[in-house]
Amino acid sequence: MLTPTRVNKIIDIVAKDYPQIKNKPIKVTIQKGKEAWTCATSNSDYELLISKVYDLEIGNNSRFAEMFLPYMDDTFKLDLTWFLADFQSALDAVVLIHELGHVIQTSEINFKKGNNWMNYARKMNAAYEDYREECFENNYNYLERAIAYRQIPYEYESDRIASEMFNKYAVRLISIISGKTQKELKTIREEKMYELQEA
């Protein structure tokens, strides 16, 4: 379960590889019953809007997870074995770091220089508009739309960062979110992997 304190611990871990994530303060807001997790930015700070858990019972979240995890495995070799230790906490970690990936991508833009920010915003808006046009013109179903969305450069880069950080720090991330010890999680993972091999 995510709390502002736990999120800030995860930000500290990510900052070891991406120190620019600390360029501006990140305000963490825990929202209730929301499907979308977002990261908004201003001249002075970021606001991360997340939920206590990435709730698979809300909206399209369950369908999204069914697409997202195989996609992340195929595209970035996300280590899915850690999902055996604690599925919910592992999913929360990956989706959270995806949002932090958006912070990392914008962290070095000088917002006080309008041209820098406007150029970035124009490119980003054009990429999302291309995605919407592609979906409309091809009459994509949910799965096709979801896959196309992941190919938007800003989403793709955040997915890459999420996979990289999760694969490197999985047991620590899951431990922070779940409250279980790293030893417990490693044991659960090993037992589940053994069960799968024996099945």
Task: Label the model's feature ranges.
Residues 4-22:
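Zn2+-dependent metallopeptidase catalytic core
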Residues 5, 129-199:
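Long, well-structured alpha-helical subdomains associated
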Residues 9-13, 99, 123, 127, ...:
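Charge-rich, solvent-exposed alpha-helical interaction surfaces
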Residues 21, 26-44:
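Amphipathic, interaction-prone secondary-structure segments
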Residues 38-90, 100-107:
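Active-site scaffold of zinc-dependent metalloenzymes
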Residues 90-91, 106-146:
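Post-HEXXH active-site segment of zinc metalloproteases
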Residues 104-117, 164-176:
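Substrate-binding/catalytic groove segments of enzymes
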